[in-house]
């Protein structure tokens, strides 16, 4: 009983640990915490956002480059009075103790090779002739708040040109002016109906319309082209003349009666040309064998089932030897030595053929070689 309770407690403990691990693993990717600079997820999400439109592509690229560059090369604290920020209540602490670099105090930090940041600093250039002090933007007081509020505007009119107008700044509008711009007060636009004067020439352009009926005058010329139509009956006249050769057709009908007789030679018709082709009637002879008896049929079926071993034809007689060994003794003049081997004169010389050669050789060379071998075997060469 105690063992069962211990097993149950261990099982419950393992299940609880599994649930805790599963929930913690699920919470990791579901976290909405924004990654801070320095973490890999920060730079990855800068260029891969789920709700980023294509129009934001360049902005995202610039943002990732700026953040990466700023984190890689942090600013020093000597860039013109804390980066032109005179905040005395919450001064920013230096990120890293960077070595002092020459600062020309013109808004361009030349030690930063970031093109995007350079373009942003270009818009913050100081005046053309700054005050002669180590920090131009601060006026020399780097640790003081040197902001001076501008004096209130005086109500005087004229002088500096910034005062309030004596009539309270109200300008009475000109009711008759309806032109564009401030410098065209005397401009009066021409009346729109005056531009409609060129409209009457439009009916004057319709005058060329009457020549259109004059172009219809050639229409009566069409009946003049129909005059050749009566010539069509004149072409039908040859048809009546051509009907005359029709009577000779019955002259060819007499040979038809000759076919009723015993296939006799038909009378040749009287017409110019080659005689008609003769029709040769070839008799068809059907050959048949007498019906075989049942015993012979069964014998034939039984013979078909036997396997007759074919007898091999007798081997052909061996061909007569082309080369006859010389009857002389072996003491013959020795042949010149071959490059690799020497064949004794008593043995059969080597015969070469096209099959023995790995390369293509002219057949005439083999014929000449074999011919000289034959002569040498007879001591003629």
From Swiss-Prot:
Residues 236-270, 309-329 are annotated as: Disordered. Sulfated by pip; may be involved in embryo dorsal-ventral axis determination. Sulfation by pip may occur on covalently bound glycosaminoglycans. May undergo both disulfide and non-disulfide cross-linking upon incorporation into the vitelline membrane. GO terms for cellular component: egg chorion; extracellular region; vitelline envelope. Residues 1-25 form the signal peptide. Its main location: secreted. Disruption phenotype: Females produce eggs with normal chorion morphology but that are fragile with increased chance of collapse after oviposition. Embryos within these eggs fail to cellularize. Follicle cell microvilli involved in vitelline membrane biogenesis are disorganized and vitelline membrane biogenesis is disrupted. This is Protein palisade.
């Amino acid at each position: 009983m105690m063992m069962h309770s211990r097993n149950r407690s261990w099982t419950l403990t393992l299940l609880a640990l599994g649930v805790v691990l599963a929930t913690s693993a699920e919470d990791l990717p579901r976290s909405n915490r924004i990654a801070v600079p320095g973490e890999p997820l920060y730079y990855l999400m800068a260029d891969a956002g789920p709700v980023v439109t294509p129009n934001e592509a360049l902005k995202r690229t610039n943002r990732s480059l700026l953040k990466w560059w700023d984190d890689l090369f942090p600013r020093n604290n000597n860039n013109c009075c804390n980066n032109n920020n005179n905040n005395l209540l919450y001064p920013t602490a230096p990120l890293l103790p960077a070595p002092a670099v020459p600062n020309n105090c013109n808004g361009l930090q030349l030690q930063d090779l970031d093109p995007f940041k350079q373009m942003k600093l270009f818009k913050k250039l100081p005046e053309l002739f700054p005050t002669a002090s180590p920090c131009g933007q601060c006026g020399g007081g780097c640790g003081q708040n040197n902001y001076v509020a501008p004096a209130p505007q005086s109500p005087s009119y004229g002088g500096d040109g910034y005062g309030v107008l004596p009539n309270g700044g109200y300008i009475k509008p000109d009711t008759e002016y309806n032109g564009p711009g401030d410098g065209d007060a005397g401009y009066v636009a021409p009346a729109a109906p005056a531009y409609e004067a060129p409209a009457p020439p439009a009916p004057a352009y319709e005058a060329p319309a009457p020549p259109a009926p004059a172009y219809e005058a050639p229409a009566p010329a069409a009946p003049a082209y129909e005059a050749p139509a009566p010539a069509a009956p004149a072409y039908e006249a040859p048809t009546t003349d051509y009907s005359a050769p029709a009577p000779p057709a019955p002259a060819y009908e007499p040979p038809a009666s000759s076919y009723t007789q015993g296939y006799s030679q038909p009378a040749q018709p009287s017409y110019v040309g080659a005689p008609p082709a003769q029709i040769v009637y070839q008799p068809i002879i059907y050959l048949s064998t007498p019906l075989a008896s049942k015993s012979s049929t069964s014998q034939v079926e039984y013979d078909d089932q036997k396997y007759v071993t074919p007898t091999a034809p007798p081997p052909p007689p061996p061909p007569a030897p082309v080369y006859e060994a010389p009857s002389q003794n072996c003491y013959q003049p020795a042949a010149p030595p071959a490059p690799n081997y020497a064949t004794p004169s008593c043995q059969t010389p080597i015969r070469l053929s096209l099959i023995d050669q790995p390369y293509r050789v002219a057949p005439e060379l083999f014929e000449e070689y074999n011919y000289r071998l034959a002569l040498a075997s007879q001591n003629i060469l």
